[in-house]
Amino acid sequence: MSDSVELFTDGACKGNPGPGGWGALLVCKGVEKELWGGEANTTNNRMELTGAIRGLEELKRPCEVTLVTDSQYVMKGITEWMVNWKKRGWKTAAKEPVKNADLWQLLDEQVSRHTVKWQWVRGHIGHPGNERADQLANRGVDEVRGIRHG
């Protein structure tokens, strides 16, 4: 039987594009693991995707994952848009290249290793897991900007 894992992810950007960070909080059997990082010049959508990718990459064996995001972009991309992007060779309905296709392809690869249930929550309304992921993403931004945390 595979482990059940909750994964809360978020991305943040100071300027868009600008310095950005991603955060992921993994919860399995009451044990929590925090992950975060950042990039000097990126977008909020790239950081949202990276949070989900890095969280899933951290799982060393197939798991049943409930992935919680406050990003409509990630949620709709993975659950609605991706199937058609793939059919069209990573092009949009307007025949334009899919933005962030490199990250969407990495996310698709990671999702294929697990059973993932996607859950969207409204951001910044006090959802504990989402708030923690937001704090981690902002830590990633701060580290890129040279701001240290205790």
UniProtKB/Swiss-Prot annotation:
<comment type="similarity">
    <text>Belongs to the RNase H family.</text>
</comment>
<protein>
    <recommendedName>
        <fullName>Ribonuclease H</fullName>
        <ecNumber>3.1.26.4</ecNumber>
    </recommendedName>
</protein>
<dbReference type="GO" id="GO:0043137">
    <property type="term" value="P:DNA replication, removal of RNA primer"/>
</dbReference>
<comment type="subunit">
    <text>Monomer.</text>
</comment>
<dbReference type="GO" id="GO:0005737">
    <property type="term" value="C:cytoplasm"/>
</dbReference>
<keyword id="KW-0963">Cytoplasm</keyword>
<dbReference type="InterPro" id="IPR022892">
    <property type="entry name" value="RNaseHI"/>
</dbReference>
<dbReference type="GO" id="GO:0003676">
    <property type="term" value="F:nucleic acid binding"/>
</dbReference>
<dbReference type="InterPro" id="IPR012337">
    <property type="entry name" value="RNaseH-like_sf"/>
</dbReference>
<dbReference type="InterPro" id="IPR050092">
    <property type="entry name" value="RNase_H"/>
</dbReference>
<comment type="function">
    <text>Endonuclease that specifically degrades the RNA of RNA-DNA hybrids.</text>
</comment>
<keyword id="KW-0378">Hydrolase</keyword>
<keyword id="KW-0255">Endonuclease</keyword>
<keyword id="KW-0460">Magnesium</keyword>
<dbReference type="GO" id="GO:0004523">
    <property type="term" value="F:RNA-DNA hybrid ribonuclease activity"/>
</dbReference>
<keyword id="KW-0479">Metal-binding</keyword>
<feature type="binding site">
    <location>
        <position position="10"/>
    </location>
    <ligand>
        <name>Mg(2+) 2</name>
    </ligand>
</feature>
<feature type="binding site">
    <location>
        <position position="70"/>
    </location>
    <ligand>
        <name>Mg(2+) 1</name>
    </ligand>
</feature>
<feature type="binding site">
    <location>
        <position position="10"/>
    </location>
    <ligand>
        <name>Mg(2+) 1</name>
    </ligand>
</feature>
<dbReference type="InterPro" id="IPR002156">
    <property type="entry name" value="RNaseH_domain"/>
</dbReference>
<feature type="binding site">
    <location>
        <position position="134"/>
    </location>
    <ligand>
        <name>Mg(2+) 2</name>
    </ligand>
</feature>
<keyword id="KW-0540">Nuclease</keyword>
<dbReference type="GO" id="GO:0000287">
    <property type="term" value="F:magnesium ion binding"/>
</dbReference>
<feature type="binding site">
    <location>
        <position position="48"/>
    </location>
    <ligand>
        <name>Mg(2+) 1</name>
    </ligand>
</feature>
<feature type="domain" description="RNase H type-1">
    <location>
        <begin position="1"/>
        <end position="142"/>
    </location>
</feature>
<dbReference type="Pfam" id="PF00075">
    <property type="entry name" value="RNase_H"/>
</dbReference>
<dbReference type="InterPro" id="IPR036397">
    <property type="entry name" value="RNaseH_sf"/>
</dbReference>
